[in-house]
């Protein structure tokens, strides 16, 4: 009997110890789960901004407001398809054309609080979306070229027509940024003049690149004199001490814009995120510290170029259709990219 009693006592102690350890582990698991998926107010965000951009802002937003945001990164096309399938978010951070197209479907609320500092050209006139960041197209100039040609005029006409200048630019088929660039050129110059200028430039384009950073990298490596580049991409190279100078086109330029919009059914937490973005988020130093060097759309004074020049952005409506874009891209391939323009 004593042996049986001892065995029972041993089993009871064993179960007690395992029970204690199980409860402790479960409590620890719940703590970890809450850290990863914290309770409290939540919002959902869809974005096509460069990977990781929005996630950098979330710790600061949560610390300021106590609101958590779940971010889903996708392409602009995927965002449109997701909304067509009835899967909505609270806030949308996306490129201008995506926001323009979705606004026409009635997906967004009209909301203008805190957006007064954003220029009219960078926001919807009905308040359905507002520009958050701009990435203007600039000249990334090889430093040696700039020093040897101190009187060079950094205008579109001079860059495209000066045969001795080696140019690198994006293939207009490569990215949304580059195809949007072709649409902007056509809208500003008109179809005939835009293609004439592009054809005139073609013989001294040394590379049509597939990646956004390529034109500025080519200039930094002295494989071209001037890379037609996004400001963000050129600034990142400068931050890495690469030998380029950023020059703004004298007669103005176009920009790729990212903006924010509220879903038509968004609540107060979503509005708090929207307000925070324009009050603090767009200029949060966390972005620049991690290499995201866009210009805030509500900047009081955009940065000067490396010669002290001001940025002038063309007034463009960008109301083109996908079929119209495809037609113009096809024309560029036939009449410029693979034509004999020598």
Positions of PLM-derived features:
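A bilobed periplasmic-binding-protein/Venus flytrap-type ligand-binding module shared by bacterial periplasmic
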Residues: 138-145, 255-269, 277, 285-289
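Early extracytoplasmic/lumenal segment of secretory-pathway proteins
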Residues: 3-6, 22-105
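Extracytoplasmic ligand-binding site segments that recognize negatively charged/polar headgroups
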Residues: 49, 83-84, 88-223
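Periplasmic-binding protein-like
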Residues: 117-122, 135, 167-173, 197-202, 208, 277-299, ...
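Hydrophobic membrane-insertion alpha-helices, especially the h-region
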Residues: 7-22
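Extracellular/periplasmic bilobal clamshell ligand-binding domains
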Residues: 302-342
């Amino acid at each position: 009997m004593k042996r049986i009693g001892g065995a029972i006592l041993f089993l009871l102690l064993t179960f007690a110890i395992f029970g204690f350890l199980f409860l402790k582990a479960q409590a620890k698991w719940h703590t970890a789960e809450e850290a990863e998926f914290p309770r409290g107010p939540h919002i959902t965000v869809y974005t096509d901004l460069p990977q990781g951009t929005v996630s950098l802002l979330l710790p600061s937003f949560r610390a300021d407001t106590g609101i958590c945001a779940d971010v889903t990164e996708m392409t602009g096309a995927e965002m449109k398809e997701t909304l067509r399938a009835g899967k909505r978010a609270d806030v949308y951070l996306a490129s201008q054309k995506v926001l323009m197209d979705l606004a026409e479907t009635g997906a967004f609320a009209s909301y203008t609080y805190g957006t007064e500092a954003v220029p009219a050209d960078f926001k919807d006139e009905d308040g359905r979306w507002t520009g958050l960041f701009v990435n203007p197209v600039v000249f990334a100039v090889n430093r040696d070229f700039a020093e040897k040609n101190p009187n060079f005029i950094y205008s579109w006409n001079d860059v495209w027509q000066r045969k001795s200048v080696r140019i690198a630019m994006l293939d207009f088929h490569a990215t949304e940024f580059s195809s949007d660039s072709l649409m902007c050129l056509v809208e500003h110059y008109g179809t005939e003049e835009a293609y004439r200028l592009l054809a005139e430039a073609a013989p001294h384009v040394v590379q049509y690149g597939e990646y956004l950073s390529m034109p500025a990298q080519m200039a930094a490596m002295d494989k071209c004199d001037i890379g037609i580049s996004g400001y963000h991409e050129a600034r990142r190279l400068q931050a890495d001490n690469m030998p380029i100078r950023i020059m703004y086109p004298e007669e103005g330029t176009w920009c790729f814009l990212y903006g924010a919009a509220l879903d038509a059914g968004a609540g107060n937490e979503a509005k708090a995120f929207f307000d925070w973005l324009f009050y603090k988020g767009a200029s949060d130093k966390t972005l620049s510290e991690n290499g995201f060097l866009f210009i805030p759309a509500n900047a009081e004074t955009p940065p000067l170029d490396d010669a002290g020049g001001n940025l002038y952005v063309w007034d463009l409506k960008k109301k083109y259709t996908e079929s119209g874009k495809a037609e113009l891209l096809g024309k560029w391939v036939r009449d410029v990219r693979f034509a004999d323009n020598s």
